[in-house]
């Protein structure tokens, strides 16, 4: 039905006359019109969502609508949104925010996200939800604007901190909330001290290593919901119990946490194809690796052992990464004794100078040329990132770097370049956090993280809603090195690369390997021979395989 709008040109004159004469103000026709407007705007009942009616250019998915409705109706606006990577937690948070705004329950909003995601959040809220979100930049907008998106690092820094903590917020949203898992950090303390009526914590990995992490997150939403910290430690943490093994704990957590898994959504997900690319060291690279490995025989200090392990991993990445670590040790020798003595460092630097090629980088160039499409490369080390950009350029391949130290504007620029003519984006762990790159479907794990949850976060950058092609993951692993041992454990033995976060929960979180990385470090530190290391790795693999097959109630025993 089309309603014809007729403008009354006499209205301004009549209004001015009424102001002059102080009346008459009563008008039955205008009153009826006003009443009709109020009736239209009125929300008939609290059940059901109104927000979708106000989204003309965007249709949320069913699981996203269910999450928003549950948070609003049953959780009183305090929830951990823990959907697997790529299911649209930002959309769910946007729906909840829109719903509270429509109902008049939220006006003053604070959204804290990693610096690299600030612009992405503002754009999504404005375009999908028609929410006038404002980005906190150089000028202070905390008090002037109602809906502010900022990095948590900016918000917690003086003089911003004092202003933000003085404002009573109706709703606070925290993205990548797993960074708040440690209650002793400044970030945790800052979020805890925020004055807030409603709060949403977004994370695909609510538990990464220890069950205490979920206690800290829940305590931000509802202090005391899981009891006191001492009680929780005695009842669950010290017994090394899993979330699944304790029905009571699971029920309590589920009252504040929603976790959708890919198979729950009913959506047709693109396939994930995983390929291992074996790398053979050149003789000079092998000599450097062996020189580093031999240091284990003469050093027993834990700190020094950790340094050796780091150097081994860096050697599998690039000679540049090894050199930068050794240089840092020498630069800091005035403040503290280096983990490795100066003479040994000099020997290692001589070995570095004898390395004339990077076998892994050569393999990457061949792979990228074979793919002939956009590729994202993940590396653990900034020195390797810089080297790779130079090396790819020497081989006629265009690339851009992406790392945590970049300012927000530069990160957006790098993403735009990659979306355009640039073929390769080289990201570090911090740089790749939270970015959405569905237009790319090839990923090279140049270096492998030892925490499978971090690996899934990487893959989730491209294997997510909106991906229209099958995803291809290439894992680089140098033969006969610590890198190969880790890859065999994670991939060939327990097939973690084919899993997604929910399945990783079943294998890692629920089976009581409370800190996966610590277990790996312990094996590699204290293995006297290659054979001993293989035996320990096989034992860990058998333990994982056995535990994941047990019913939930028996996994904690």
From Swiss-Prot:
GO molecular function list: ATP binding; chromatin binding; DNA binding; helicase activity; hydrolase activity; nucleosome array spacer activity
Annotated GO biological process: positive regulation of transcription by RNA polymerase II
Chain location of the short sequence motif DEAH box per the record: 175-178
UniProt KW keywords: ATP-binding, Helicase, Hydrolase, Nucleotide-binding
Matches recorded under SMART domains: DEXDc, HELICc
InterPro entries reported for this sequence: Helicase_ATP-bd, Helicase_C-like, P-loop_NTPase, SNF2-like_sf, SNF2/RAD54-like_C, SNF2_N
Domain (Helicase ATP-binding): residue spans on this chain: 70-224
Pfam families hit by this protein: Helicase_C, SNF2-rel_dom
Binding positions for ATP per the UniProt entry: 82-90
Enzyme Commission number(s) of this protein: 3.6.4.-
All residue ranges annotated as the Helicase C-terminal domain in the record: 363-524
Alphabetical list of SUPFAM superfamilies matching this protein: P-loop containing nucleoside triphosphate hydrolases
Family to which this protein belongs: Belongs to the SNF2/RAD54 helicase family.
Name by which UniProt lists this protein: Uncharacterized ATP-dependent helicase YqhH
Species annotation: Bacillus subtilis (strain 168)
Gene behind the chain: yqhH
């Amino acid at each position: 039905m089309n309603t014809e709008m007729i403008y009354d040109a006499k209205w301004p004159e009549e209004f001015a006359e009424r102001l002059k004469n102080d009346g008459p103000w009563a008008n039955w026709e205008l009153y009826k019109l006003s009443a009709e407007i109020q009736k239209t705007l009125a929300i008939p009942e609290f059940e059901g969502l109104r927000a979708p009616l106000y989204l003309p250019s965007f249709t949320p998915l069913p699981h996203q609508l269910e999450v928003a409705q549950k948070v609003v109706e049953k959780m009183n606006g305090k929830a951990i949104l823990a959907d697997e990577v790529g299911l649209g937690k930002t959309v769910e948070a946007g729906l909840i925010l829109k719903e509270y705004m429509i109902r008049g329950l939220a006006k003053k909003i604070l959204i804290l996200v990693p610096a690299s995601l600030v612009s992405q959040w503002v754009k999504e809220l404005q375009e999908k939800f028609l929410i006038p979100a404002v980005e906190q930049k150089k000028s202070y907008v905390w008090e002037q604007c109602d809906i502010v998106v900022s990095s948590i690092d900016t918000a917690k820094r003086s003089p911003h901190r004092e202003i933000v903590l003085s404002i009573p917020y109706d709703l606070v949203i925290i993205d990548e909330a797993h960074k708040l898992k440690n209650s002793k950090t400044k970030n945790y303390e800052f979020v805890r001290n925020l004055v807030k009526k409603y709060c949403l914590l977004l994370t695909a990995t609510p538990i990464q290593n220890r069950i205490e992490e979920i206690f800290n997150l829940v305590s931000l939403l509802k202090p005391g919901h899981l009891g006191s910290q001492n009680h929780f430690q005695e009842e669950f943490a010290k017994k090394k119990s899993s979330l699944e093994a304790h029905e009571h704990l699971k029920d309590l957590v589920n009252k504040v946490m929603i976790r959708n898994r890919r198979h729950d959504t009913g959506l047709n997900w693109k396939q994930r194809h995983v390929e291992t690319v074996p790398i053979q060291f050149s003789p000079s690279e092998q000599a450097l690796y062996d020189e580093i490995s031999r240091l284990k025989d003469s050093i027993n200090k834990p700190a020094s052992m950790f340094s050796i392990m780091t150097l081994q991993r860096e050697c599998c990445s690039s000679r540049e990464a090894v050199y930068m670590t050794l240089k840092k040790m020498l630069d800091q020798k005035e403040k503290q004794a280096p983990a490795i003595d100066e003479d040994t460092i000099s020997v290692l630097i001589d070995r570095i100078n004898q390395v004339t090629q990077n076998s892994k980088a050569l393999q990457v160039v061949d792979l990228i040329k074979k793919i002939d499409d956009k590729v994202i490369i993940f590396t653990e080390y900034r020195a390797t990132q810089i080297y790779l950009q130079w090396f790819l350029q020497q081989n006629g391949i265009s690339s851009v770097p992406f790392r945590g130290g970049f300012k927000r504007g530069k990160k957006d620029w790098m993403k735009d370049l990659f979306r355009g003519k640039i073929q390769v984006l080289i990201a570090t762990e911090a740089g790749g956090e939270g970015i959405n790159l569905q237009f790319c479907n090839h990923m090279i794990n140049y270096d492998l993280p030892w925490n499978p949850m971090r690996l899934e976060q990487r893959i989730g950058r491209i294997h997510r809603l909106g991906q229209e092609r099958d995803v291809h993951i290439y894992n680089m692993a140098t033969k006969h090195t610590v890198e190969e041992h880790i890859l065999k454990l994670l991939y060939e033995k327990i097939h973690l690369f084919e899993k997604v976060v929910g399945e990783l929960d079943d294998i890692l979180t629920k089976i009581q390997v409370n800190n996966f990385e610590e277990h790996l470090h312990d094996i590699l530190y204290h293995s006297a021979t290659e054979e001993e290391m293989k035996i320990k790795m096989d034992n860990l693999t058998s333990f994982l395989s056995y535990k994941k097959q047990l019913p939930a109630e028996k996994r904690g025993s």
